[in-house]
Design a protein with these regions (language model features):
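C-terminal motif of bacterial Sec signal peptides marking the signal peptidase cleavage site
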Residues: 2-4
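Bacterial signal peptide processing site
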Residues: 6-8
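Electropositive phosphate-/nucleotide-binding environments in soluble metabolic enzymes
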Residues: 11
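Post-signal peptide N-terminal segment of mature Sec-exported envelope proteins
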Residues: 14-35
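A cross-family detector of function-defining hotspots
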Residues: 31-75, 89
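A short, surface-exposed interaction/processing loop segment used at functional sites
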Residues: 77-90
Length: 90
């Protein structure tokens, strides 16, 4: 697993996410890439009763004790990343 250092700076983190998973990336590839970078990901489909958004999305989170937490959401259309949801650091 490539964990590396992620920036606590929100702009730098968002740029890194967009570099790792560009628009048009297949859902399975997006999940594989993010998990490779130490994130835990959950794919939520429109058939999930807790999904009120109307689209499939992938939520990825990475937590580190006494440091920062990172999270990113990828929104899918036709099985590919069509836009980015929230991307944040805590």
């Amino acid at each position: 697993m490539l964990t590396g250092c992620l920036s606590p700076d929100p702009v730098k983190f968002e740029n890194k996410i967009r570099e790792w998973v560009p628009l048009g990336t297949a859902a399975a590839d997006a999940q594989r890439i993010m998990e490779h970078h130490g994130f835990e990901c959950h794919f939520i489909t429109t058939s999930n009763i807790f999904n009120s958004s109307g689209f499939d999305y992938l939520d990825c989170d990475r937590e580190q004790v006494r440091f920062h937490d990172w999270s990113a959401r990828f929104i899918f259309q036709d099985g590919k990343v069509s836009e980015y949801g929230r991307i944040k650091t805590n």
